[in-house]
Amino acid sequence: PYTITGAPRVVKGNVLIVNGGAELGVRGYLSAYSAETGSLVWRFYTVPNPNKQPDGAISDNALKDIGNLTWGDEGAWTTDGGGGTVWDSIVYDEVNDSVIFGVGNGSPWNRNHRDAGKGDNLFLSSIVAVDASTGAYKWHFQTTPGDNWDYTATQTIILADLPIGSEGASRRVAMQAPKNGFFYVVDADTGEYLSGEAFVPQNWAEGLDENGRPIEKPEARYGETPFMQNPGPLGAHNWQPMAFNPDLGLVYIPAQEAPEFYAVDRLFKTRVQNWNTGTSLPAGIPMDLDLATAMAIRATLKGRLIAWDPIAQEARWSVEHLNAWNGGVLSTAGGL
């Protein structure tokens, strides 16, 4: 089935349209249509064809050289499309003439069901850059390799020029605070990882390595044992837009702390036009959970507005909200 949540964008005479609903068993892509004729100009698929053969699309070379190598030949992805929908963030970088977009979660969420628990599954949960005119692949940075938790990278992508180059020289960067709880700064021209740090408390990774890859805690894969994880599938930051004030050099993130128990759905079977995750969230909750513990868990649900310094990779200030789920942010030149 076709669904869409993010608004189309117009870049250089082309209308960029995407699809949503990875859990419905679809394969993600970004399409460019001519605004004048309505004809398809190019299409970039975010995950391989299930048989790993060419699609006749501009993404063929990138998938052949990069994507196919990170997927196995078995698992639900071969019949369910693999996911990777581009359901929100798309930006045009006029300096590098690139379209930069965020890719969503896998179908199903649980990698053990999706791909027999193997591989990074590119370009799931990645920031991808393509040529604005042709759609040809330029670079990618994967925020959550082998995503297992609905940790999309479709959240707001902001372009900026920051003084983080050699001797404080300005550098064109892309910034994102995706669901997984880490704030990333990458080079907008090459995709090189520059820095990253957790912007909310999280318990699924020890941190990021020198290449920006999360250092996962083994228990976070919730194989035999359910795991209560922060962030949960709602993420540390969801679709609510974040904002950047270039005068102050701060990014304002509508963040949340919403942990969740993850467990394997051992009875998983794809259901057409249904929500297919391969993950049993209720099954992860201990049946003997006492009221006091349940209330303590509920008290951990928080929302906050964080003013984040992308150079120092730390919060300047934060304001806690009564509820976890709040609205987006607009930062003005007047200081609001």
Where are these regions (language model features)?
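Noncatalytic, solvent-exposed loop/strand surfaces
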Residues: 1-336
